């Protein structure tokens, strides 16, 4: 399954129902929820972008899977790579590598961290999307 492309649902609630997510597990930060927390967070960000009319939204990875971008959008004729992190641990090797090769790009990251501009990367808290 490592070579599989991500598949997203129309709605985060439907996704939670399909994987039989117990709301209590989400609220108490149970280890069971960790298995698909990243996918649910990506689903949330995608759903919010779609509701704001962002289109098209792409996913990108290389053949050897060394570079994977959760989302890529176009804004004002510029490519904008987007990384989504479910926690405050925001190490993103793919995004760092891309920005090293293409310093003219400005990337966005959505995570549990507060708003912060770090060179050509802007972190937005998940609640702000």
State the predicted function of each range.
Residues 58, 81-84:
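Short catalytic-loop micro-motif centered on adjacent basic/acidic residues
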Residues 78-80, 106:
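Structural motif
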């Amino acid at each position: 399954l490592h070579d599989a492309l991500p598949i997203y649902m129309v709605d985060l609630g439907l996704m939670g129902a399909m994987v039989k997510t117990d709301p209590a597990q989400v609220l108490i930060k149970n280890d069971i929820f960790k298995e698909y927390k990243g996918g649910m967070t990506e689903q949330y960000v995608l759903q919010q972008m779609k509701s704001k009319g962002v289109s098209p939204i792409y996913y990108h990875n290389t053949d050897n899977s060394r570079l994977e971008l959760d989302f890529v959008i176009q804004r004002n004729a510029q490519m904008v790579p987007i990384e989504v992190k479910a926690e405050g641990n925001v190490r993103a090797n793919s995004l760092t590598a891309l920005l090293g090769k293409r310093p003219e790009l400005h990337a966005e990251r959505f995570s549990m961290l507060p708003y912060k501009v770090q060179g050509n990367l802007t972190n937005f808290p998940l609640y702000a999307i």
